[in-house]
């Protein structure tokens, strides 16, 4: 089982999935629009799921904006400015006392489609997210392409 969290400008949505994709739990709260409260809310979400299912679980989080590969800072999260210039991956990993995989939401969307979505039979996948903001993700051979 794994926990997936979608951190957005308006909501934080969590899902607990079995390895076969079966959804066991889903929850949604409003984004607090404050960095430390975001860290605290996600930590509480994970702790509550783990308490309910009596397991320590892997956690993956998609977020708006990109991560500067040199500094680890989130940048260009235009509709979630409280995330900008923060080391989100480092901070949430520290708060949860484990390595948490964090990635741009559009990259996660494109990767998901490449593995088990409508693009699973294609070598190259480009996904666009239109929500509170707009973003794109490119996947080639089931690997996210990251660059400037």
Predicted features, each with a name:
Residues 2-6, 58-60, 125-129, 135:
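Short glycine-aspartate micro-motif
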Residues 2-40, 73-74, 144, 148:
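Short glycine-rich, Thr/Ser-proximal phosphate-binding strand/loop in the N-terminal lobe
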Residues 18, 63, 140-141:
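A cytosolic small-molecule/anion-sensing beta-strand core signal
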Residues 32, 36-43, 47, 57-59, ...:
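Glycine-rich phosphate-binding loop and adjoining helix at the ATP-binding site
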Residues 52-56:
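Short helix-terminating capping/connector loops at secondary-structure junctions
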Residues 64-67, 131-133:
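Short glycine-rich anion-binding loops that position phosphate/pyrophosphate groups of nucleotides
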Residues 122-148:
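Glycine-rich phosphate-binding loop of actin/hexokinase-like ATP-binding domains
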């Amino acid at each position: 089982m794994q926990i997936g969290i979608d951190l957005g400008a308006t909501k934080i949505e969590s899902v607990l999935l079995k390895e076969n994709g079966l959804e066991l739990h889903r929850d949604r709260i409003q984004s607090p629009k404050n960095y430390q409260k975001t860290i605290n809310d996600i930590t509480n979400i994970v702790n509550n799921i783990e308490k309910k299912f009596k397991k320590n679980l892997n956690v993956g989080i998609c977020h708006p904006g990109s991560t500067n590969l040199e500094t680890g800072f989130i940048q260009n999260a235009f509709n979630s400015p409280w995330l900008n210039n923060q080391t989100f991956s480092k901070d949430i990993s520290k708060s949860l006392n484990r390595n948490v995989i964090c990635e741009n939401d559009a990259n996660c969307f494109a990767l998901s489609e490449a593995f088990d979505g409508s693009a699973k039979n294609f070598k190259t996948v480009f996904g666009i997210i239109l929500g509170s903001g707009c973003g794109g993700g490119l996947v080639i051979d089931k690997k996210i392409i990251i660059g400037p």
